[in-house]
């Protein structure tokens, strides 16, 4: 334990908080261009073909981002909005593509949790 005099001279060292989405550089979202759109398989207990895209952000960093929801219209050179948020069963995927923003269309025929998938409110049936 340090003495009062040692604390006066040096002080306590602040513990730096590590960012979970460093490529965004503190921004809530970043725009980017898809360089590759492909499917990949998840870690051990799970089995699926997860849709992901390699995205070059406007700051020059290239990241792997997950495309949520059923079906998508993305291809190479699509302009997308990338937010933070990892996918637990895909190693190295620490970002999500925002559905319904820029070139990425919202999910079709979605009625619940629409705001998370960029889906407009359906017309009321009579």
UniProtKB/Swiss-Prot annotation:
Gene Ontology MF terms: rRNA binding; structural constituent of ribosome; tRNA binding
Transmembrane segments: none
One GO location term (cellular component): small ribosomal subunit
Keyword rRNA-binding in record: yes
GO biological process: translation
Role summary: With S4 and S5 plays an important role in translational accuracy. Interacts with and stabilizes bases of the 16S rRNA that are involved in tRNA selection in the A site and with the mRNA backbone. Located at the interface of the 30S and 50S subunits, it traverses the body of the 30S subunit contacting proteins on the other side and probably holding the rRNA structure together. The combined cluster of proteins S8, S12 and S17 appears to hold together the shoulder and platform of the 30S subunit.
Name the UniProt record assigns to this protein: Small ribosomal subunit protein uS12
Organism, scientific name: Carboxydothermus hydrogenoformans (strain ATCC BAA-161 / DSM 6008 / Z-2901)
């Amino acid at each position: 334990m340090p003495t009062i005099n040692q604390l006066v001279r040096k002080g306590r060292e602040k513990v730096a908080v590590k960012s979970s989405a460093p490529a965004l550089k503190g921004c809530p979202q970043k725009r980017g261009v898809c360089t590759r759109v492909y499917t990949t398989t998840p870690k051990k207990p799970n089995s699926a073909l997860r849709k992901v895209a390699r995205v070059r952000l406007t700051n020059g960093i290239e990241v792997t981002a997950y495309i949520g929801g059923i079906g998508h219209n993305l291809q190479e050179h699509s302009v997308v909005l990338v937010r933070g948020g990892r996918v637990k069963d895909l190693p190295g995927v620490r970002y999500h593509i925002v559905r319904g923003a820029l070139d990425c269309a919202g999910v079709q025929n979605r009625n619940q949790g629409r705001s998370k998938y960029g889906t407009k409110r359906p017309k009321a049936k009579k």
